[in-house]
Each structure stands twice: as C-alpha cells, then as structure tokens.
C-alpha cells in the first residue's frame, strides 16, 4: 500500500476543508494501464485476458485465484488497520470487484465476475476492516448488497438523472433503482449509513432532454441521499 500517497491526499483534503471518500479498483478498462500491481504475476497470481466493449486486450486479476484473493484480503485488512476511523475520511466505497470496483463486468469478453463465495469473502473483509468508518456499496451488487446492507452499510447509485439517455425503453430512475433497492432490503439503510448519488451527465443535459429537474431532485431526496 502506498501510504504516502494516501496521506498526501488526506492532507490535501484536510487543507481544503473537506473529507475524502474513496474506492479500491482492481479491473481497469484502459489498455497498458492496469490497476493491479506488477508483482502479482511474479508471485504466481493469475491474470485474465479480456476485452471491454471490443477494446483490448486488457489484463485483470483473477480474484478467484487463491494467491490473488489472499493478497487482496490482506490488502483490505491492512488498509483498515491504518485508516479505519480516520477523521478525514467520510466513507469508504466497498469496491474491489468488477470494472472500476463497481460490481459488474458488463461488456467484458474473457473475464467474468468472481464466484459468490469470493465476493462474500471480499465484502466480509471490508466489514471486518472498517468498524468505525462508514461503508457504502454500489446498488448493482445484487445479493452482496443485501449481505452488506444487513451488516450496516449504506449504498451508492450511479446515473441519478437518467430518464432515458441510454435507451428509449429503459432508464435507471424508473426501472433500475426501484427494483434493486427493495430486492436488497436496502431502503432503510439511510437511517444508519450514508447514501450517495453519482449523476449521469449534468443539469444541462437534463434540461436539453426535457427531463424535470424538480422530479430528479425530489427523487434523490425521497431516497434520503446524503451526497
């Protein structure tokens, strides 16, 4: 772990009067810029070759490989030992798995999501490592979000504001969030943990598309968004 980098980032955050939220990412979609360390392969850790939306080849770690999983669980443990309860950290996004740590491998050819057993071990590692700093998890995590929420995490959702920007027949606001959150039993998570929204595009796009700003903002507030 590059503690010096994190400490510099926390210092800059503190100097600006803010707090830091961050997520660990293992799978990069940028060719020749992997997120995992070079030494992983040298110790016998297995890498997978894949493509993202036809682009690649891309090298990603196989979290189901015992050598890779052991190192990653140890990484999470040491991260928590150093930073759990740090006064300048607002929350930690429970990531690691999938593209950008967002719990999916959509558009991938050659790499799948880790097994449910591996996913649960990673979630449990975060739960064990961070007892003081709040955790939240992307709502696309499916059963893992349910498991995490049952143990006190909050949730984060991508694409607040999407009323049809990707498809004429599907959107996040009306079809994704109303299904994912009840299935995970996470609708009351806001009472004890953070809820974070990440927008798709910005208000200029929303206005240009004719989408109601009032509806979007009221939607975010109705689900008790913290950020």
Residue spans of the language-model regions?
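Aromatic-lined substrate-binding rim segments of carbohydrate-active enzymes
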Residues: 1-53, 113-134
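Catalytic-core regions of glycoside hydrolase
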Residues: 14, 91-227
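Active-site groove signature of glycoside hydrolases
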Residues: 48-112
